[in-house]
């Protein structure tokens, strides 16, 4: 995908993953196979962004293969599982499982259950934590549990969801009311994608 007001530049795998997920969702809502065809076409591009460096995973950018990011791999897992649900093709389920396992192994912070941003090809971890990255792993775990019945995926999702609640929500007290927790101020899109995962769970 490209910004429509700019000339062609670098192609980012994560941006195309979001488009693929959208096409899957439109297909689910309409049953129109042209949207499924678009989703499967985009998936071929995503697959071109994988290799055996660091044991697997999807790169962030086609022209700058310096890191493999949670923002490519977590929604990439969701994307694969949505394609599996739409087609019944076991290859998509296998890819979803593999991407999930790779992301968990390389980018999960075992201390709190949230996910780091990226891993460089030198093995260095980009330690920033964003709501959408962890939220997509919640959704991925929930979808894998639905597809397989394996409760380990459900437990993973529940742990990361609880960690999201601890990290990305804060207390709010309305005038004259009782205190409760709401999503912290920040990037609204990141928060919205996190909520997708919480809703799936």
Predicted regions and their residues:
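Glycan-recognition and catalytic cores of secretory/periplasmic carbohydrate-active enzymes
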Residues: 1-201
């Amino acid at each position: 995908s490209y910004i429509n007001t700019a000339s062609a530049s670098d192609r980012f795998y994560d941006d195309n993953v979001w488009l693929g997920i959208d096409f899957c969702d439109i297909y689910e809502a309409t049953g129109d196979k042209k949207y499924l065809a678009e989703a499967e076409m985009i998936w071929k591009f995503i697959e071109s962004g994988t290799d055996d460096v660091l044991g697997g995973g999807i790169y962030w950018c086609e022209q700058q293969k310096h890191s493999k990011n949670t923002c490519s791999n977590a929604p990439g897992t969701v994307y694969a599982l949505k394609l599996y649900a739409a087609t019944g093709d076991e290859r998509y389920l296998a890819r979803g499982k593999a991407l999930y396992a790779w992301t968990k192994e390389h980018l999960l912070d075992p201390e709190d259950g949230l996910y780091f941003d990226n891993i460089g090809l030198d093995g260095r971890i980009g330690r920033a934590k964003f709501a959408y990255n962890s939220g997509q792993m919640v959704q991925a775990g929930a979808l894998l549990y639905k597809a397989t019945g394996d409760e380990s995926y459900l437990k993973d999702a529940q742990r990361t969801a609880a960690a999201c609640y601890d990290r990305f929500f804060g207390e709010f007290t309305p005038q004259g009311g009782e205190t409760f927790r709401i999503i912290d101020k920040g990037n609204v899109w990141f928060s919205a994608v996190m909520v997708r995962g919480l809703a799936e769970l």
